[in-house]
Design a protein with these regions (language model features):
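Long, positively charged amphipathic alpha-helical accessory segments at protein N-termini or as interdomain linkers
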Residues: 65-68, 72-92, 102-188
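Active-site metal-binding loops of divalent metal-dependent hydrolases
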Residues: 33-35, 100, 130
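Residue-level signal for inorganic ion chemistry
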Residues: 13, 58, 99, 129, ...
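N-terminal lobe of the biotin/lipoate ligase/transferase fold
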Residues: 1-87, 108, 115, 156-157
Length: 188
């Protein structure tokens, strides 16, 4: 099962995970309430707020024995997150390779980074940023059209409850994904 290593504030869950990859285990989750230097693909800055119950800023550590479907991992994580967002009555769309949109606005982003020594994979760090409770005035700080579950539903989201659902969906599908890859668009 997973172990969650939580911080009030980090520069980045991804940076911490890279620095501590040796001691982190398969399925460990590094999380924080606020990132001071969160980033996505191409080092794009990820806006971080710890107001109103917060958002999701996590890195999931994976140390798979089978790397056959590694090229599908970001898409797999996005499908799992989309399935979780659907549980809140939202209709997610994908902007592949690594974004989820609601009504054309970004609600989540993912970044999978692997570390190899020669041909041996030391681990994969899957960074996830998901906007749970950002309000309209905070969304204006983001350099692209963005939204949050709260902005779409006008209901506050309990971060622990959301993460429990996300991890449940992930753990339910992950072993099959390692063996078979993504089968169709719908998981969960």
């Amino acid at each position: 099962m997973r172990r969650v290593i939580h911080f009030d504030e980090l520069n980045s869950t991804s940076v911490y995970s890279h620095q501590h990859l040796e001691e982190l285990e398969n399925f460990d989750v590094v999380s924080c309430d606020k990132q001071t230097f969160g980033h996505g693909q191409f080092e794009r800055k990820w806006y971080s707020s710890d107001k109103n119950g917060g958002n999701v800023y996590i890195s999931i550590i994976l140390k798979p024995s089978n790397l056959e479907h590694l090229n599908e991992l970001t898409r797999f994580i996005a499908l799992i997150a989309a399935s979780t967002l659907e549980e809140y009555g939202l209709k997610p769309a994908f902007k592949f390779p690594n974004d989820i949109l609601i009504n054309g606005k970004k609600i989540a982003g993912f970044l999978a980074e692997s570390e190899f020594i020669g041909t041996t994979c030391k681990g994969i760090i899957v960074g996830c940023g998901i906007n749970l409770n950002l309000e309209e005035n905070e969304l204006k700080n983001i350099d692209q059209p963005a939204t949050s579950i709260f902005n779409e539903t006008k209901k506050r989201v309990d971060k622990k409850e959301f993460l429990d659902k996300l991890f449940f969906n992930f753990e339910k599908e992950y072993e099959e994904f390692l063996v078979s890859g993504i089968k169709g668009e719908k998981l969960c």
